[in-house]
Amino acid sequence: NGRCCHPACARKYNC
């Protein structure tokens, strides 16, 4: 699944 967990995305997607 296309999960984005690097810092820039972690803010939005809270990984």
Curated annotation (Swiss-Prot):
Q: What is its main location?
A: secreted
Q: Which Gene Ontology cellular component terms are annotated?
A: extracellular region; host cell postsynaptic membrane
Q: Give one GO molecular function term.
A: toxin activity
Q: Where in the cell is it found?
A: Secreted
UniProt keyword annotations, A-Z: Acetylcholine receptor inhibiting toxin, Amidation, Disulfide bond, Ion channel impairing toxin, Neurotoxin, Postsynaptic neurotoxin, Secreted, Toxin
In which tissues is this gene expressed?
Expressed by the venom duct.
Show which residues constitute the signal peptide: none
Here the disulfide bonds are C4-C9, C5-C15
Q: Which residues carry this modification: Cysteine amide?
A: C15
Supply the domain comment.
The cysteine framework is I (CC-C-C). Alpha3/5 pattern.
The entry assigns this protein to a family as follows: Belongs to the conotoxin A superfamily.
Described by its record, this protein's role is as follows: Alpha-conotoxins act on postsynaptic membranes, they bind to the nicotinic acetylcholine receptors (nAChR) and thus inhibit them.
Q: What is this protein called?
A: Alpha-conotoxin-like MIB
Q: Which organism is it from?
A: Conus magus
